[in-house]
């Protein structure tokens, strides 16, 4: 890991004013986008990040490093060209091909291509649409080896409330008021256009990752007996099957990465955690919407298992060595070189904040997981208490690497 040391003890409240001040002091171009009645995001040209949403100009709902609290610390982080600057980002996968020089020495050979992250981004704006474009020069370390040029364009724009057209009793909130009015909302869509040029049959896919604050529970909308693959240390009892999908505790203290087989998932992942004073019984919910295509050749693989692939969604949990965050990850449409047609994917990011029971009802609409289950998780129930443990019946037998006792090198996912 490079750059300033991150204190993993707990999250630091970093509000809208602090984020914009740090970016401005570092000379980083950014744009503020209104994504709800009282919610905004900040699109940064450094690393092509989306920070927020920020409700009522308060703290960011996704994870940001402590360096955002101080101009000097943030300047040092940027000067180091480190990738770990928080927020929502797009990388190009498979990681095993473009970031791992030697899959037999995964952590020892991890290397982030600097043209990918932080990269050089051109930032533009038309109305409420912000565009970021960059060219990444990549080297493939798996067969076929060689150089790959990736042209990546992102368009970030507001997303309408996903529940706005619901009718009937199920759409009602407290006292019969519409559920859409019972919770705060901030949402945006990231359109990702990916084109590659290479001299061989190189695989590539856009890869959307949001760094979220740990301490909550992820819900993957999925079929029963979902195929789940361990990439690092086994997830174990932090995962359980629940009605409507799979629940996973993201602690920020237990390193693991898991993948979900494309035929078994809808493409939606939710993440709920408590916010504020426990006595107020409030929660925040993040739902990522993407397209999971069972016919697509999703090419990410665990390092010890060549040929084990086909996962369209991933979850990552840090052990504290990189800041104690977690990541919600979704894959875009795979392309195959040498010169395929460019593809465009759309990733939705819907955020809701309010009373726990209301937020849980929103989750039921979007994920198919019962509201009572989501509310229990938001109030601190572990996955094993929400449903039967899925560690033995759901996870594959894919081997996991030996735990690494040393501080992690840069690269998490």
Where are these regions (language model features)?
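Surface-exposed acidic/polar loop and edge beta-strand patches at domain peripheries
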Residues: 2, 6-189, 193, 197-247, ...
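Long, low-complexity, intrinsically disordered segments
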Residues: 396-413
